[in-house]
Amino acid sequence: MKQALRVAFGFLMLWAAVLHAEVRIEITQGVDSARPIGVVPFKWAGPGAAPEDIGGIVAADLRNSGKFNPLDRSRLPQQPATAQEVQPTAWSALGIDAVVVGQVTPNPDGSYNVAYQLVDTGGAPGTVLAQNSYKVNKQWLRYAGHTASDEVFEKLTGIKGAFRTRIAYVVQTNGGQFPYELRVSDYDGYNQFVVHRSPQPLMSPAWSPDGSKLAYVTFESGRSALVIQTLANGAVRQVASFPRHNGAPAFSPDGTKLAFALSKTGSLNLYVMDLASGQIRQITDGRSNNTEPTWFPDSQTLAFTSDQAGRPQVYKMNINGGAAQRITWEGSQNQDADVSSDGKFMVMVSSNNGQQHIAKQDLVTGGVQVLSSTFLDETPSLAPNGTMVIYSSSQGMGSVLNLVSTDGRFKARLPATDGQVKSPAWSPYL
């Protein structure tokens, strides 16, 4: 926990002021069919009101995963603070087989102890499936809640939790000196801060695999340029600023390379930079347009969008040579893919019959499932555990962020209050 807090603290060193206009998750579909679970408000052992609702954070995280449906607080049969106080029959009568309880205790030095227990209501009374405690300062109470959520989620599903991750996105506001902002927030929209403000468009943020940097496209020099910004100190490295288009950056999973698209020779083609030496290699060639690269887990293979067959489709190619292979065949066109961290599936923008939605394709069987039902969906980005996708869509005269689970059951919206939100990128584990 201490190491995790040190890593996360680096994000706050540069931005002391957190924005007040934030995005918040609004669930639109899918919770009722999820697994029921009990999350009891954590007992506050100090004077006055609790500084943070840790139980509420855990319940929201589990609900936002799409896999759990926490029992409403008004229906809780009891409010125990420890496993020993849990009455299994009271919970099992409501179909609840697991309950999260906990306490928050203030320390004399101003810090807090946060403790939780995950209790099995189907076993002997007091049976604990998982438990932990953390000592944190006030600003890390939400992080402690997300940590508990990660551990509970993994214990119950066998899947690593992704509640301590962040999202990067571009916000376009109306007017002002800097109408374009690259922002980062917790995955649930809290703790939002500005990475970069610009009078010109910002596009295509992409995370480094260690979560310490963002690559993105800026037009501040009068033409497009690719840059990499270190989040802890704000240092910016220019990667490419060739004539015409520079765009679509993507870090390799091993962190040694950056793929991107350039049109300096005419058509859009893919290039890969060795980040240590700065050497750039051209990967694709020809008259077709090749763009939107995403890496397979081996850090040697790219999936990308190409119009070599007429309409945009997704292809894959080894960066060390060989012919590109088309991998999408359903729908009139497919583009802007994001490959899962295990390489078993990808999500993409799929168009058919005039509709443009987010779809998931199994990379073994080729099977395709349409996940979203919003309007003009684009720029999908997978959570690092592969359970959720964040993407942007059109709503009214603007754009908003949306979440959908990769099984298609759970859907949510992250509306912003101060502008159009687009180009989301989900961070790696932090």
Curated annotation (Swiss-Prot):
Principal subcellular localization: periplasm
Entry keyword set: Cell cycle, Cell division, Periplasm, Signal
InterPro entries in the cross-refs: 6-blade_b-propeller_TolB-like (IPR011042), PD40 (IPR011659), Tol-Pal_TolB (IPR014167), TolB_N (IPR007195)
GO cellular component: periplasmic space
TM annotation in the entry: none
GO biological process, one term: protein import
Compartments it resides in: Periplasm
Family to which this protein belongs: Belongs to the TolB family.
Family matches, as NCBIfam families: propeller_TolB
Database matches in HAMAP family: TolB
Protein name: Tol-Pal system protein TolB
Species in which this protein is naturally found: Salmonella typhimurium (strain LT2 / SGSC1412 / ATCC 700720)
Classification lineage: Bacteria, Pseudomonadati, Pseudomonadota, Gammaproteobacteria, Enterobacterales
